[in-house]
Amino acid sequence: MKKTLVIVAHPQIKESVVNQRWIEELRKHPDKFTVHEIYQVYPNGIIDVAKEQALIEAHENLIFQFPVYWFNCPPFFKQWLDDVFTYGWAYGSTGNKLKNKKIMLAVSAGIQSKDYSDTGRYQLSLNQALYPFELTALYVEADYQPIYAFYGTESNPTSEEVDQSAIHYVQKLILLANMTSKHF
């Protein structure tokens, strides 16, 4: 079985509580996960597209882990997507490298889950806010999976809450790697 590639796109990972803890938990399973921190790998912002594409091709599943920034992803991750998901590789008449590959978002959100609802402060769900990622997965014919989210990072979550989320996150990714049906 191929490993799962986790693309970590956090511009201030050293200040992150949740994303750092998730990375720690993932790194306990080097036989299952490759953790790839793009802000650390490319501090100058120049992406080695061929290297990134080869890394993706060498993995069965692709996880995008990032903090929600202004109801979107951090800017360098958007650049990474634009640069790496190229015509002829990710899409187009000969672009099929992501076809049927499982893709999932793992995000940390500053606001509470109640605010991400039809009746919440922003009147839309996190799935709705991040829908462009699902559309991207559909466009490249990947197998998009439900989002894994930790809400309320701005509300100083307890270390127990963060630890539980990290354990649950890794368990979910292990299940994802072992599943044969389309969604879990």
What is the meaning of each model-derived region?
Residues 50-134:
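Helix-loop-strand module that forms the ligand-binding subsite of alpha/beta enzymes
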Residues 32, 62, 143:
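Residue-level detector of anion-binding/catalytic polar loops
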Residues 24-27, 133-184:
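Glycine-rich phosphate/pyrophosphate-binding loop and the adjoining helix
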Residues 1-33, 168-170, 174-175:
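N-terminal beta1-alpha1 ligand-phosphate binding loop
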Residues 6, 35, 64, 103-107, ...:
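Structural beta-sheet core signal
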